[in-house]
């Protein structure tokens, strides 16, 4: 190969290499250009360990406290023996599930011991929340109703803390009560009592000091029953499923 051809070949090789490097660089930049993740969030409670890893937290402040807290559902077909005491076999099958009818969050009267004031919380991960956003969830007690149940929904409007106080009379940083299901512990059918079939509840968020600017907050589900527990005349079991936070 003469010198002229050699120089021409080298020039072409340099141009080709420059184009190839430029192309690879452009591909790399394109791969990093992704849309921001949605602020909305859906939880199916198919695995409580995964849920805990996601930032959910159970806090049991029942008095006296029992051996259980919020946990994975434990549905057993025709399971309950009809009286209070153990072992506990749940009559609640999940609202929706892929592999098991126990794919929901669940709590029962063993959150307390003896005659107990049940005060057992399940708190969401941080949610980037603003006024006008929506939370929804499905809940039920067992059918038929043997012992009435109650659940409250609270909002922490000022921070992202898990602080729910230390006693049944306190709610800590969760100062906004969004919902109280069956506050009078009625044994009758919903809407007076607690729903005994899966029922959807939807809440529009309002009153946040940050207005329409998303900030980190948490929502707390509170199993809250006076004179409950294994020795009580009220409290049985409730399920929570298909939680949605919808950013508007």
Predicted regions and their residues:
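Terminal, low-complexity interaction segments
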Residues: 176-248
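Extracellular beta-strand-rich recognition modules
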Residues: 45, 122-143, 151-155, 214-228, ...
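Surface-exposed intrinsically disordered loops and tails
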Residues: 68-88, 170-196
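Extracellular ligand-binding interfaces
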Residues: 133-185
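Bacterial Sec-dependent N-terminal signal peptides
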Residues: 17-48, 247
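Sec-dependent bacterial lipoprotein signal peptides
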Residues: 1-22
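Short beta-strands within extracellular/lumenal beta-sheet-rich domains
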Residues: 114-134, 198-203, 240
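Extracellular glycan-recognition surfaces and repeat-rich motifs
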Residues: 44-104
């Amino acid at each position: 190969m003469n010198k002229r051809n050699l120089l021409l070949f080298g020039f072409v090789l340099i141009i080709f290499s420059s184009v190839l490097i430029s192309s690879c660089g452009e591909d790399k930049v394109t791969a990093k250009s992704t849309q921001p993740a949605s602020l909305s969030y859906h939880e199916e409670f198919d695995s409580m360990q995964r849920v805990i890893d996601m930032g959910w937290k159970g806090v049991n402040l029942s008095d006296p406290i029992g051996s259980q807290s919020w946990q994975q559902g434990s549905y057993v077909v025709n399971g309950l023996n009809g009286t209070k005491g153990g072992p506990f076999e749940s009559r609640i099958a999940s609202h929706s599930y892929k592999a098991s009818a126990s794919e929901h969050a669940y709590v029962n009267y063993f959150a307390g011991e003896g005659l107990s004031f049940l005060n057992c919380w399940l708190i969401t991960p941080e949610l980037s929340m603003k006024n006008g956003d929506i939370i929804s969830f499905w809940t039920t007690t067992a059918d038929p109703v043997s012992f009435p149940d109650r659940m409250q929904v609270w909002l922490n409007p000022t921070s992202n803390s898990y602080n729910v106080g230390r006693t049944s009379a306190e709610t800590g940083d969760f100062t906004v009560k969004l919902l109280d299901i069956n506050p009078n512990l009625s044994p009758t059918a919903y809407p007076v009592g607690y729903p005994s079939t899966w029922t959807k509840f939807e809440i529009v968020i309002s009153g946040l000091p940050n207005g329409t600017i998303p900030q980190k907050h948490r929502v707390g589900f509170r199993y809250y029953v006076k004179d409950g527990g294994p020795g009580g005349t009220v409290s049985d079991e409730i399920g929570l499923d298909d939680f949605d936070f919808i950013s508007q």
